[in-house]
Amino acid sequence: MSVDTSSFGRAIASARKALQLSQKDLAKKILKEEDGEPITPQYLNDIEHDRRSPSSDHIVKQFAMVLKISPDVLYWLAGRVPGDLLTRQNVSSRQIDQAFMAFRRALKEK
């Protein structure tokens, strides 16, 4: 499935449409971590129109799972760093710099 990667919201909307899900149907499948309740269709609409961003890593992972999109792609589009990378211990500034340089090189090869 090809997903519009111009923004987080557009990626969510294009993947949802490719799976033939309504906003209401998708919203029911995305459960908030705090209370296990689904997000509202209005919140989803705001996300799809880039008026709001996902509120947590949990929401990003839920979208990835339901819409069959790589979580890393969604983190990138949301402008977020996955929580598991933020909590890594003993990572030097040199390692971080090298990782970002490799990432930038890979994007240029496109």
Task: Name these PLM-found stretches.
Residues A78-K110:
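Interfacial/linker helices and their anchor residues that mediate assembly or domain coupling
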Residues M1-L21:
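A short, Lys/Arg-rich alpha-helix, primarily the initiator
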